[in-house]
């Protein structure tokens, strides 16, 4: 079974705002810094581009459940989890996910993925594009 992903409204808004912000910073810095060396704008452009396209490349685009694996498809490097490693599956309500803290991950730009933690569930790894219907 294959399932396509779609962004929730918050992820859409965050993605649009970050895209506009990065574009304004990249274009604006070159117009403001004319007489100085171009090393700072070039470095900033490379850094913001790496952040943006790196995040884009690792976002979940679909999920596939096979007889032996759960596959999270991403533009780069699919995640494959053996079904034998999955201890249980349950739908999580907002209360269980409340106060989740992003330890190392993305919280809105093209989705929500990476390492998160909260007091109720402990350490979690997310590969999500929506905050509702969490499993």
Across the structure, where does each feature detected by a protein language model lie?
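Non-transmembrane, membrane-adjacent beta-strand/coil modules in membrane-associated proteins
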Residues: 73-135
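Conserved beta-hairpin
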Residues: 46-90
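Short hydrophobic/aromatic-rich motifs at helix boundaries and adjacent loops
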Residues: 23, 39-42, 131
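General structural signal for secondary-structure boundaries
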Residues: 11, 37-38, 64, 93
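Small-residue packing motifs within transmembrane alpha-helices
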Residues: 19, 24, 44-45, 50
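Hydrophobic alpha-helical transmembrane segments
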Residues: 34-46
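N-terminal membrane-targeting/pre-transmembrane regions
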Residues: 1-36
């Amino acid at each position: 079974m294959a399932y396509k992903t779609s962004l929730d409204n918050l992820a859409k808004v965050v993605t649009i705002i970050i895209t506009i912000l990065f574009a304004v910073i990249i274009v604006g810095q070159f117009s403001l810094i004319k007489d100085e060396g171009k090393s700072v704008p070039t470095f900033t452009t490379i850094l913001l581009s790496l952040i943006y396209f790196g995040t884009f490349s690792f976002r979940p685009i679909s999920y596939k459940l096979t007889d032996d694996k759960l596959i999270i498809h991403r533009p780069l490097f699919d995640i494959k989890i053996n079904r034998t490693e999955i201890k249980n599956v349950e739908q999580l309500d907002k209360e269980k996910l409340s106060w989740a803290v992003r330890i190392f991950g993305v919280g809105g730009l093209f989705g929500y993925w990476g390492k998160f933690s909260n007091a109720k569930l402990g350490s979690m790894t997310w590969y999500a594009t929506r905050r509702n219907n969490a499993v």
